[in-house]
Swiss-Prot record:
Pathway where this protein functions: Protein modification; protein ubiquitination
Gene name per UniProt: rfp-1
Subunit note: Interacts with ubc-1. Interacts with mrg-1.
Matching SUPFAM superfamilies: RING/U-box
Lineage of the organism: Eukaryota, Metazoa, Ecdysozoa, Nematoda, Chromadorea
Name of the protein: E3 ubiquitin-protein ligase bre-1
Assigned GO CC terms: HULC complex; membrane; nucleus
Zinc-finger found in the keyword field: yes
Tissue-wise expression: In adult animals, expressed in oocytes, germ cells, pharyngeal and intestinal cells.
């Protein structure tokens, strides 16, 4: 909320009141003076207030019409922006469809045919679609792209599966007795050639993808820097735009007000020119009333000067607004040029010693190829050697493990035969014990059924359920009566609080005297005093009538409250009596329930003992049955194991014969593999020498690259320092230009105001009628609210003793602008009070 100067209503200053009105200082916030006509009663005041409210509403309507036109322009701009967004979306959608087509063609070229899903629409078809159909086709396009990726991955997986099948096939061929090494070597060479071609393709793709990824990351960094700069700029422009909107809104409201005033003054001038001047009476009071109330008098020189001043102010505000818009456009252009230059400098520094130039050089590519080939050959030879050694060790370990297993299984069979004989003996003993226990269980069960009957238990349960339901109903009724008692006490407390609040409101009513009007001739002062005394008498009479009515209302309220309190007290006594009766009944019922509960608990204890004995007997029988089941299962398992051991003995004899044959084949393979290992070791030494040479070359290239990187970092640091200095200087220059421009504008406005003050001083002194009219106007302005200018003063601030209307203060309090418009002091709910002037 803006701070207001300590000024009176209509422009009078309480601190210092200079004699000349023309030499007054310009106020920070100036209430617009309203010329009110003569008033005979309160209804006339309200009628005039309605007239001024309609004028304010017309001004608001003009403002809203202009805002609607501006919003329509913004709507057109947003439509254009939406069209550009749709075109960008079309580009992205087509790019995704191109990716899908590329993946499909790759899968067809490498792995065969590709079975795709439903085709998604093109980007041109998507533009005219509704929201539902667009969502369906968008999901279809996503599914097609996902299917393309899945098919490509599946094809890769199938190829890897084929290679594993081929390796398994080789192993089976080597294990078979009819082993032909020439055929295996041919298949291996063919497979190695196909795998080498695939590896070359994959390596080229990997290098290409790595270079693309590096370029994309570099572009991403550049774009992120640009984005951060643009975001900062957008935030600054948003703040500037908000300030500009606030200024334009304020100027629009002023322009609407001035246009409405101009239109009203022109209409009054035309009506005055058409109708003749009315004759003035001899009395000064009648003349002033006619001047104020007559609408067909032509406008005076002061009104014409005010219109000219308003027009000049409007032109000044328009010129200032146009200048500031031009400044904003120039600043936007400067910022765009600076961002472009910054991005160019950044790109130049990054591309001067770029990694792409090193990576794309022929020497680097040749070194990379030789290095990759040497590493592949080294890995292949080392893998072959490891496979041969692992196979040899596996054969030896398998042979030893089989011999150990055969000896262990022979010992296990002997142990199992002994266990079977022991289990047979224990089984016969357990069966005899189970029959004895079953007979005992049947006898106990018959005795228990004779002692206890089911009908007695049912009767006991029914009586317990009825007693529980009665207890619940009594408790619910007790809770309901307590709630009723609490509600009656709350009503009594609320009525007492209302009584106290009404008494306090009656005591807080105040009357505030008004100050006398100074600096006026004695005849006018006497007349004004007579009018003032008559007005005060009427106000006192009205206040006394309202006080009597209020006292009558308060007495009636007290009677009603006392009557309600008596009714509530009688209800409370009846409720207390009923509560006592219910508590006595509840105690009797609880005693009966306790006696019944003890009897029920004794019966339950007896039943629990009988149940425990029954469960123990059942547990014994179950244990006997479980033991019998376990014995049957062990017999079946032993029979199965005997059959398995017989079959294993036959298979072990056959396996021993196979091992002798495999031993001979493995010895031949070991001799061949030892020869191949010697040849591969010679090749490996040669390749290691080549690798060391290439490694030295790569280290030299890396050192040169690091030096270039250090130089580039140093250049970037220098460039950033220069940019920061440039930005700081540019900001200082812009601030200085802005301050200078604002100072020039303020000087120009002060010059215009000084000329206007000189012109007003040259005007001759006003006539006696105008002086009296001005005094009458000031008197009426003292009685009107300075905030809304329409309603009379009927409320006072208890902190600062400033007067306003009650509606304005309530609106300020409700909108949380809880500060006095004159002295800017805070106020609360109890800091303002209604008065009668």
């Amino acid at each position: 909320m803006m701070k207001r100067s300590n000024e009176g209503i209509g422009g009078e200053n309480y601190a210092s009141s200079p004699s000349d009105d023309g030499q007054q200082k310009r106020r920070k916030i100036q209430f617009e003076p309203v010329r009110m006509p003569a008033v005979s009663n309160v209804n006339d005041i309200r009628a005039r207030a309605v007239v001024y409210q309609t004028s304010k509403l017309k001004q608001q309507l003009l403002y809203k019409n202009k805002r609607i036109a501006e919003l329509e322009k913004e709507n057109e701009r947003s439509k254009r922006r939406q069209q550009t967004d749709e075109s960008n979306f079309l580009k992205v959608y087509n790019m995704f469809s191109d990716i899908e087509k590329y993946i499909c063609t790759q899968t067809k070229n490498e792995f065969g045919e590709y079975i795709g899903g439903d085709t998604a629409p093109t980007g041109i078809d998507v533009l005219g679609m509704t929201n539902e159909t667009y969502n369906k086709f968008f999901d279809q396009a996503k599914q097609n792209l996902r299917n393309a990726f899945v098919s490509y991955a599946k094809a890769r997986h199938d190829r890897a599966h084929e290679s594993t099948i081929f390796i398994d096939k080789l192993k089976t061929l080597i294990d078979s007795p009819t082993f032909n090494p020439n055929g295996v070597h041919k298949e291996l060479t063919a497979k190695a050639a196909s795998l080498a071609i695939q590896n070359e393709k994959l390596q080229s793709e990997v290098t290409k993808v790595q270079s693309d990824c590096y370029n994309l990351e570099r572009k991403k960094r550049i774009l992120t820097d640009k984005l951060s700069v643009q975001e900062n700029r957008v935030q600054e422009l948003e703040h500037q735009l908000e300030d500009a909107r606030f200024e334009t809104d304020k100027h629009m409201r002023l322009a609407n007000k001035f246009e409405y005033k101009l239109a009203t003054l022109v209409s009054e001038g035309q009506s005055g020119g058409n109708g003749g001047a009315t004759p003035s009476s001899s009395g000064t009071t009648n003349a002033t009333e006619k001047k104020i109330s007559a609408p067909d008098i032509p406008p005076s020189e002061t009104a014409a000067k005010e219109i000219e001043n308003l027009r000049l102010e409007r032109d000044e505000q328009e010129s200032i607004a146009s200048r500031r818009l031009q400044d904003l456009e120039e600043m936007n252009k400067k910022v765009q040029t600076l961002t472009q230059e910054n991005s160019k400098l950044r790109l130049e520094t990054q591309t001067f010693f770029s990694v792409d130039s090193i990576v794309n050089s022929e020497e680097y590519k040749n070194l990379k190829k030789y290095y990759s080939l040497a590493i592949k050959e080294y890995e292949r030879v080392s893998k072959d050697l490891e496979d041969i050694t692992t196979e040899r060790d596996a054969f030896r370990s398998a042979k030893e493990a089989r011999a150990m297993l055969m000896s262990e299984e022979h010992q296990k069979t002997l142990k199992e035969i002994q266990c079977q004989s022991d289990i047979h003996n224990s089984f016969y003993k357990v069966s005899h014990d189970s029959e004895v226990l079953r007979c005992e269980f049947e006898t106990v069960k018959e005795e228990y059924n004779k002692t206890v009957k089911q009908s007695e238990w049912d009767e006991m349960k029914a009586t317990l359920n009825t007693l529980r339901s009665m207890n619940r109903s009594l408790k619910s009724e007790k809770i309901r009566l307590r709630e009723k008692d609490k509600q009656s006490q709350k009503d009594i407390n609320t009525l007492k609080s209302e009584l106290t609040s009404l008494k306090e409101a009656q005591d807080k009513c105040l009357l505030v005297p008004l100050e006398d009007v100074s600096n006026a001739p004695p005849e006018d002062v006497n007349k004004i005093r007579q009018e003032y005394e008559s007005l005060c008498k009427e106000v006192k009479r009205l206040g006394a009538m309202e006080k009597q009515e209020k006292q009558k209302q308060v007495e009636n309220l007290q009677k009603e409250v006392n009557r309600q309190i008596a009714d509530k007290l009688s209800e409370l006594e009846t409720l207390r009596k009923t509560n006592e009766m219910l508590t006595n009944d509840e105690e009797c019922i609880s005693d009966e329930l306790e006696a019944i509960g003890t009897a029920v608990e004794e019966e339950q204890e007896r039943n629990a003992q009988l149940y425990i004995e029954k469960r123990e007997q059942e547990d014994r029988n179950l244990k006997m049955m479980n033991d019998r089941m376990i014995q049957n299962q062990t017999f079946n398992r032993l029979r199965e194991k005997l059959s398995c051991l017989e079959s294993k003995a036959q298979t072990d004899a056959q396996i021993a014969k196979m091992h002798e044959f495999e031993k001979k084949a493995n010895e031949e393979l070991v001799t061949k593999l030892s020869e191949s290992v010697q040849f591969k070791s010679a090749e490996l030494t040669r390749l290691t020498n080549l690798m060391e040479q290439h490694r030295k070359n790569i280290q030299e290239v890396g050192m040169s690259r690091d030096e270039n990187q250090i130089k580039a970092d140093r250049c970037e640091g220098q460039m950033k320092q220069i940019q920061e200095l440039y930005a700081a200087k540019a900001r200082e220059i812009e601030d200085f230009k802005f301050k200078r421009q604002r100072a020039e504008e303020e000087l120009e406005t002060l010059r215009i105001k000084y000329e206007r003050v000189k012109r007003n001083e040259s005007v001759p002194a006003q006539s006696g009628d105008q002086v009296l009219e001005e005094a009458n106007r000031q008197m009426k302005e003292t009685l009107t609210c300075p905030s809304c200018k329409t309603r009379p003063k009927d409320c006072i601030m208890l902190k600062c003793y400033h007067l306003f209307c009650e509606t304005c203060i309530k609106t300020m309090y409700d909108t949380r602008q809880r500060k006095c418009p004159k002295c800017n002091s805070n106020f609360g709910a109890n800091d303002f009070h209604r008065i009668f002037i």
